[in-house]
UniProtKB/Swiss-Prot annotation:
Organism of this sequence: Homo sapiens
Keywords: Acetylation, Coated pit, Cytoplasmic vesicle, Membrane, Phosphoprotein, Repeat
Signal sequence segment: none
Protein name per Swiss-Prot or TrEMBL: Clathrin heavy chain 2
CHCR repeats: 537-683, 686-828, 833-972, 979-1124, 1128-1269, 1274-1420, 1423-1566
Positions of post-translational Phosphothreonine modification: 394
Length: 1640
């Protein structure tokens, strides 16, 4: 059998798997305040970060770059507390905002969240609580006890109400860990030191106690062993039994002698204590008895942090390895474990009762039976009540208690049992029935109500039936709770709560007999019946048949209610409801035509009998509605021709509902009836529906009546949108026939849809007086030739000129071509060309004329164009062609003219004269074309000359390709002719490079020999000689010595170097020797030929320094030092001075070194040489020579020498040297020592060193040389870190004016910084306040505003203070300052701008009082600005109390759009006082939120009738009909009185008004009132009044209508009665009694 475990273990995840470094898993870096978050401080590289692990999503840790010494997460939300030093901050991570911050006076060594909004802070001396609420600061709770001195604080706990506080610490003493705790009572403000390691508080309710007790549990490990203590802290609550202290041993295994408790948590649900030790052991204890339930090791590593695990009421923790573990009670096993393994049945029972756990059923049954048998009924009842899962709360148990008779003077055992059950919780169904039966028998219904409210009873249908006999409303509550729909609805009906029936039935899904219910409701209240009927049909699927509901209304003659119901019921317009729709419309057309008209107008219904309704509409005078319903064309045509009786807009829309044929028939009928009257309307219809009716049919319709005007207007409305060519053609024809030539022009110009050929033919046939439309069409569609022919043949040459001059000059070439085709006179054509001033293509004109071989025709015009300065290539091209064809000096023209297109003219000349083609191509650099012409015509000489002159490498590469068959002929001409003729070196150079690029060395030698050796101009050309020799070295080495000997003007050094690299050493030596480059020659002898003897002989023979130097260097390399030095001296060569100086320095021979360096300086002037020479002179004490030397030109490092002299104390020499090298900083320091201040300042400026400036500045200040000090200071203040020291130096000595002058002068500096502007502003506030505002206005953005704010406030500079507050966005303070000091700080624009930005709205209201006091005339401007932020009700009240409402009338108007009651009433009051009745009427119509009746009562007494009319209007709007009618009667507004009486639906009021008209003799009003109040007047009363006043004739129309209605009603009632009699044979009527069980 598997082992039974009372606890369950779970590993949630491992921190290392989430990327957490094991080094960061520890007490100092990881915190866990609850089971929601784990927070770890990490350091990745140099970057500190905080990692937050959400336990609900641990695989997605949140990492934030936060540097903090400690971080703890809020136990409930994503709020983190951070500590850095003494600074504490709380941030909301989700909102990304800082919530609170505080700086402690002492270091916080431990802190912890003790609730969701409180952090406990522990310092070395005290404990504080810091609440997140409001702006509260940490509050000190208690001072730390001396027993915790030197302890490491590891925990802090509080009870649930934070009345008991506990601080836990540990320390190492005598080779063991000692725990120290301090328990503090908040109420008693006393502490108690306790030895302990881990502790927790618990709220535990013992059996028999009314309230839970606060228990304090703590564990300790001392030298004698471990103990767990459980005690109650504080006084027990009233009526509670005190908790008996428990102290039990805590077992530590022998192998864990150094183990001790580290954590404790309470499992509140199960009443257990979880105790964790350092070695990872879990101890589980019963909280009430202290019994140890189990002990087990759950972790091999220390669990250093724990928290309650709320989902399981267990404990969760983290160990050193990074495992996140939780432990909880195993509910399925723990009772069995306690009973069977621990052999502790009492513990099992307590656990089962406490947590309602299974496993102890037999124990409970046995105990219950034992107690019951002993007569301990109360105890047995408690056992039954507390038994888990309700195992004893059965009918048998109730019967057992019922069987026991009650003792005299005592409650029966059954009632005792029920009482205990009620104390424990809710009764079940059986218990509830039995108890209620007993209570109701005793007449104690109030107990039943109390238990129901407390939810102590399980409601059922049986319970409701039981209660209903006593209280139906109480039974309704029971039925609702028991979910018995039939009984609930029955109770609703019996109690008159009809509207709740539908809602409840829908909610619970129950379906009663709705018609039966409705008929009963209707008899009780028609209005409630209407509402009930609406609820029955408000869903998509009605709950009852609508026809049956309508029958119920008609049975009771409720026409108005029936109409209202049907409008709601039929709103979905279903086809199946057609008959109902017909009934509704017929009913209202007979009784209320205006209602029917409204219904039809809204087009709510579409499925009624339209033919029947159409007839009724016609009879009711609704002609428009009748026309909409007619379907027969004869009826429609008969009605539609009466257009003067119909709304034109409606009629146009009506045609949209007709078929195409019917629409055309109706239009035909309308035009036939009265074309003058109906033409415009027909055009509108045709325009709107032309797509449906067909444009062609409509055109034929208008043409059949010869109405071109109508056709023009119709087509004009659609032509801009139509793509039909016929439409555009017909429109053009109609426009022509109606004389609309301008419109013809427009459509011809803009339209792209007509057939141009047809339009052109029509316009030609139309013979219009203005040919412009024809011109436009021909121009647009390329009929220019036809146009010219037409115009020319019809003698309309004037329009040809108009066309080319005004319409489209660009068509001139085509026009000229056409004129040439009709053999027009050349003079006319020339004149026409000359007359055109617009832009046209010369190319096209030339092409047109050239096609016809009439090019010379253009000569005069072309020459005139050129004389006018025309530079167009086409013009010059044409002229060139004419000159070429006429042989009129064409070559001269081609060479001199700069504007023709060379490619065009060259191509023109190719077949005529290739030479001219070359001229043209050469002029335009048409390379490929020229080469092609030359090759085709064997013009190689011209081609060679062109290539040489062209100097284009790419072109050369093209012609020198191997694929060029003419390359050899071309090269011959280049060599023989082109290069011989040229005098341009660049041409030669490009040509040679081209041959080199083409890799033609033999041809290149041939070319170069021709140039260089044949005594040409370029024979002495250096580069060409170089190239010839180099080419020979590359291609033919046998010629090299010959060329070297014959030529004299080549680069010897380069040639010799190339010869060396090509192993031609003798040739190289010959070149060097020939050109006297003996040093190079001896180098060849030494390095390449390798003969030193020959080299020495050569040096003796030459006796040149360079030669000796070469020889000396070689000797030095052979260690011949003495000989080498002699050679250097003979060669006068200091080049190896480094080696010489090093050797001389080692021998310390300064005199010889001076001689060598002097020689070397004469030759080399090297810096090192001169530096060493200066130092050598200094060392040899030759000061005068030193001064002469440094004053003369030199390249020495004088600074180094000066430093060496300065270090050795030679200051005069150093001064000379520093002066020479301009080391002004060191020189200034030297001069300060010598007392030369002026020179020191000058040199400081040159040095530009802050340290030097400070030193000189302070020295000048001490000497009161303020001018020099300011000069120095300007270079110091630009360094922010130096400014404070400089200012202190000035101010300590009282030089304030000088300091201000210094800072003012410094503001213009390029490096001016914020500190300068800030400090100057502060100085102004102290010593020159009049200049401060100007300074701030200029430089506010560059000052430290908080610092200047403090200074301005201290100096009472209010205007400046406001300015700064505004710029710093502290608008509240700015407004307060302006209101506190208005004479100095208030400015209107500034105030209005700032007041809108304040955060405290209260300031807006204070501003209103401020303006009333100081600026009342500007109050409206302020109100308009503040309007979005003001409470308008408060504002109106404020000005009303101040008696200033008229002053703010503009404001009231501006905010009335908010429809605020106070604003409306205040403005209405003002308008009344001003007698502005129009404004008042507009106000009350637009804004209805005011006391209508109060205003009406005021206005009815007004002396102006207009205001009394408004009063009547208000009474009417508020259903005060009698007052409204009386006012109308008084002011003789009889029509209004009748309308108000009719709208009131008050028959008595209408009757009184009718009688009043008779009393006043208003016969016409009597008749009008009969019509207006028709449905409110009783016919018998009207008949009597008419007869008595002899007005029967006036009343006759009324009686006729009444008779008609009564006859209709009688007919309908007769039909209904017949139907009812038929139904009576089917079923007998049932009384209004509801059972709802499916039976009546």
């Amino acid at each position: 059998m598997a082992q039974i475990l009372p606890v369950r273990f779970q590993e949630h995840f491992q921190l290392q798997n989430l990327g957490i470094n094991p080094a960061n898993i520890g007490f100092s870096t990881l915190t866990m305040e609850s089971d929601k978050f784990i927070c770890i401080r990490e350091k990745v590289g140099e970057q500190a970060q905080v990692t937050i692990i959400d336990m609900s999503d641990p695989m997605a840790p949140i990492r934030r770059p936060i540097s903090a010494e400690s971080a703890i997460m809020n136990p409930a939300s994503k709020v983190i507390a951070l500590k850095a030093g003494k600074t504490l901050q709380i941030f909301n991570i989700e909102m990304k905002s800082k919530m609170k911050a505080h700086t402690m006076a002492e270091e916080v060594i431990f802190w912890k969240w003790v609730s969701v909004n409180t952090v406990a802070l522990v310092t070395e001396t005290a404990v504080y609580h810091w609440s997140m609420e409001g702006d509260s600061q940490p509050m000190k709770m208690f001072d730390r006890h001396t027993s915790l001195v030197g302890c490491q604080v590891i925990h802090y706990r509080t009870d649930e109400y934070q009345k008991w506080l506990l601080l836990v610490g540990i320390s190492a003493q005598q080779n063991r860990v000692v725990g120290a705790m301090q328990l503090y009572s908040v109420d008693r403000k006393v502490s108690q030191p306790i030895e302990g390691h881990a502790a927790a508080f618990a709220e535990f309710k013992m059996e028999g106690n009314a309230k839970p007790a606060t228990l304090f549990c703590f564990a300790v490990r001392n030298p004698t062993g471990g103990k767990l203590h459980i005690i109650e802290v504080g006084q027990p609550a009233a009526g509670n039994q005190p908790f008996v202290k428990k102290a039990v041993d805590v077992f530590f295994p022998p192998e864990a002698q150094n183990d001790f408790p580290v954590a404790m948590q309470i499992g509140a649900k199960h009443g257990v204590i979880y105790l964790i030790t350092k070695y990872g052991y879990l101890h589980l204890y019963d909280l009430e008895s202290g019994v140890c339930i189990c002990m087990n090791r759950i972790s091999a590593d220390t669990i250093f942090v724990t928290a309650p695990h709320k989902p399981t009421s267990g404990i969760i923790g983290v160990n050193k390895k990074g495992q996140v573990l939780s432990v909880c009670v195993e509910e399925d096993n723990i009772v069995n474990y306690a009973t069977n393994v621990l052999q502790n049945p009492d513990l099992g029972l307590r656990l089962a009762v406490r947590s309602n756990l299974a496993g102890a059923e037999k124990l409970f049954v046995r105990k219950f039976n034992t107690l019951f048998a002993q007569g301990s009924y109360a105890e047995a009842a408690k056992v039954a009540a507390s038994a888990p899962k309700g195992i004893l709360r059965t009918r048998e148990t109730v019967q057992k208690f019922q069987s026991i008779p009650a003792q005299s003077g005592q409650a029966s055992p059954l009632l005792q049992y029920f009482g205990i059950l009620l104390d424990q919780g809710q009764l079940n169904k059986l218990e509830s029935l039995e108890l209620c039966h007993l209570v109701l028998q005793q007449g104690r219904k109030q107990l039943l109500e109390k238990w129901l409210k407390e939810d102590k009873l399980e409601c059922s249908e049986e319970l409701g039936d039981l209660v209903k006999t006593t209280d139906p409303m109480l039974a309704l509550s029971v039925y609702l709770r028991a979910n018995v729909p039939s009984k609930v609805i029955q109770c609703f009906a019996e109690t008159g709560q009809f509207q709740k029936i539908v809602l409840y039935a829908k909610k619970v899904g129950y379906t009663p007999d709705w018609i039966f219910l409705l008929r009963g409701v209707m008899k009780i209240s028609p209005e409630q019946g209407l509402q009930f009927s609406r609820m029955l049909v408000q869903d998509e699927e009605p709950l009852a048949n609508i026809s049956q509901i309508v029958d119920i209304f008609m049975e009771n003659s409720l026409i108005q209610q029936c109409t209202s119901f049907l409008l709601d019921a039929l709103k979905n317009n279903r086809p199946a409801e057609g008959l109902l729709q017909t009934w509704l419309l017929e009913m209202n057309l007979v009784h209320a035509p205006q209602v029917a008209d409204a219904i039809l107008g809204n087009k709510m219904f579409t499925h009624y009998d339209r033919a029947h309704i159409a007839q009724l509409c016609e009879k009711a005078g609704l002609l428009q509605q009748a026309l909409e319903h007619y379907t027969d064309l004869y009826d429609i045509k008969r009605a539609v021709v009466h257009t003067h009786l119909l709304n034109p807009e409606w009629l146009v829309n009506f045609f949209g509902s007709l078929s195409v044929e019917d629409s055309v028939e109706c239009l035909h009928a309308m035009l036939s009836a009265n074309i003058r009257q109906n033409l415009q309307l027909c055009v509108q219809v045709a325009s709107k529906y032309h797509e449906q009716l067909g444009t062609q049919a409509l055109v034929e319709l208008f043409e059949s009546f010869k109405s071109y005007k109508g056709l023009f207007y119709f087509l004009g409305s659609i032509v801009n949108f139509s793509q039909d060519p016929d439409v555009h053609l017909k429109y053009i024809q109609a426009a022509c026939k109606t004389g609309q030539i301008k419109e013809v022009e427009r459509i011809c110009r803009e339209s792209s849809c007509y057939n141009p050929e047809r339009v052109k033919n029509f316009l030609k046939e139309a013979k219009l007086t203005d040919q412009l439309p024809l011109i436009i069409v021909c121009d647009r569609f390329g009929f220019v030739h036809d146009l010219v022919l037409y115009l020319y043949r019809n003698n309309l040459q004037r329009y040809i000129e108009i066309y080319v001059q005004k319409v489209n000059p660009s068509r001139t070439p085509a026009v000229i071509g056409g004129l040439l085709d009709v053999d027009c006179s050349e003079e006319v054509i020339k004149h026409l060309i000359m007359a055109v001033r617009g832009q046209f293509s010369t190319d096209e004109l030339v092409a047109e004329v050239e096609k016809r071989n009439r090019l010379k025709l253009l000569l005069p015009w072309l020459e005139s164009q050129i004389q006018e300065g025309c530079e167009e290539p086409a013009t010059h091209n044409a002229l060139a062609k004419i000159y070429i064809d006429s042989n009129n000096s064409p070559e001269c023209f081609l060479r001199e003219n700069a504007y023709y297109d060379s490619s065009v003219v060259g191509r023109y000349c190719e077949k005529r004269d290739p030479h001219l083609a070359c001229v043209a191509y050469e002029r335009g650099q048409c390379d490929l074309e020229l080469i092609k012409v030359c090759n085709e015509n064997s013009l190689f000489k011209s081609e060679a000359r062109y290539l040489v002159c062209r100097k284009d490498p790419e072109l050369w590469a093209h012609v020198l390709e191997e694929t060029n068959p003419s390359r050899r002929q071309l090269i011959d001409q280049v060599v023989q002719t082109a290069l011989s003729e040229t005098r341009d070196p660049e041409e030669i150079s490009v040509t040679v490079k081209a041959f080199m690029t083409a890799d033609l060395p033999n041809e290149l030698i041939e070319l170069l020999e021709k140039i260089v050796l044949d005594n040409s101009v370029f024979s002495e050309h250096r580069n060409l000689q170089n190239l010839l020799i180099l080419t020979a070295i590359k291609a033919d080495r046998t010629r090299v010595m010959e060329y070297i000997s014959r030529l004299d003007n080549y680069d010897a050094l380069d040639i010799a170097s190339i010869a060396v690299s090509s192993a031609l050493y003798e040739e190289a030596f010959t070149v060097f020797h020939k050109f006297d480059m003996n040093a190079s020659a001896i180098q060849v002898l030494i390095e390449h030929i390798g003969n030193l003897d020959r080299a020495y002989e050569f040096a003796e023979r030459c006796n040149e320094p360079a030669v000796w130097s070469q020889l000396a260097q070689a000797q030095l390399q052979k260690d011949l030092v003495k000989e080498a030095i002699n050679s250097y001296i003979r060669g006068d060569d200091p080049s190896s001075y480094l080696e010489v100086v090093q050797s001389a320095s080692r021998s310390n021979n300064w005199e010889d070194l001076v001689k060598f360096l002097q020689m070397a300086r004469k030759k080399g002037r090297e810096s090192y040489i001169e530096t060493e020479l200066i130092f050598a002179l200094a060392k040899t004490s030759r000061v005068s020579e030193l001064e002469d030397f440094i004053n003369g030109p030199n390249n020495a490092h004088i600074q180094q020498v000066g430093d060496r002299c300065y270090e050795e104390g030679m200051y005069e020499a150093a001064k000379l040297l520093y002066s020479n090298v301009s080391n002004f900083a060191r020189l200034a320091s030297t001069l300060v020592h010598l007392g030369e201040y002026q020179a020191a300042v000058d040199n400081s400026r040159k040095a530009s060193s802050t340290r030097t400036w400070k030193e000189v500045c302070f020295a000048c200040m001490d000497g009161q040389e303020f001018r020099f000090a300011q000069l120095c200071g300007l270079h110091i203040v630009i360094h922010a870190d130096e400014l404070e020291e400089l200012m202190c130096y000035y101010q300590d000595r009282g030089y304030f004016e000088e300091l201000i002058l210094l800072l003012e002068a410094a503001l213009g500096l390029e490096r001016a910084h914020m500190g300068m502007f800030t400090e100057l502003a502060i100085l102004y506030s102290k010593f020159k306040p009049q200049k401060m505002l100007e300074h701030l206005e200029l430089f506010w953005s560059r000052v430290n505003i908080p610092k200047v704010l403090r200074a301005a406030e201290q100096a009472h500079l209010w205007a400046e203070l406001v300015f700064l507050y505004d710029k710093y966005e502290e608008y509240d303070n700015a407004v307060l300052t302006m209101m506190s000091h208005p004479t100095e700080a208030w400015k209107e624009g500034q105030f209005k701008d700032i007041i809108t930005k304040v955060a405290n709205v209260e300031l807006c209201y204070r501003a209103l009082q401020f303006y009333l006091d100081y600026k009342p005339l500007l109050i409206n401007d302020l109100l308009l600005v503040l309007s979005p932020r003001l409470d308008h009700t408060w504002t109106v009240s404020f000005f009303s109390k101040a008696g200033q409402l008229p002053l703010v009338k503009p404001y009231l108007r501006s905010v009335q759009s908010h429809n605020n009651k106070s604003v409306n009433e205040a403005l209405n009051h003002l308008l009344t006082e001003e007698e502005d009745y129009q404004g008042l009427r507009a106000s009350i119509d637009a804004y209805d939120n005011f006391d209508n009746i109060s205003l009406a009562q005021q206005l009815e007494k007004h002396q102006l009738m207009e205001f009394r009319c408004i009063a009547a209007y208000l009474y009417k709007g508020n259903n005060w009909w009698a007052q409204s009618v009386e006012l109308c009667k008084k002011d003789h507004l009889y029509k209004d009185a009748m309308q108000h009486a009719a709208e009131s639906r008050d028959a008595e009021l209408a009757q009184k008004l009718l009688q009043w008209f008779l009393e006043e003799g208003k016969r016409e009003c009597f008749a009008a009132c009969l019509f207006t109040c028709y449905d409110l007047l009783r016919p018998d009363m009207v008949l009597e009044l008419a007869w008595r006043h002899n007005l029967v004739d006036l009343a006759m129309p009324y009686f006729i209508q009444v008779m008609r209605e009564y006859l209709s009603k009688v007919d309908k009632l007769d039909a209904l009665e017949s139907l009812r009699k038929q139904e009576e044979h089917v079923t007998e009527p049932a009384p209004l009694v509801f059972d709802f069980d499916g039976h009546e």
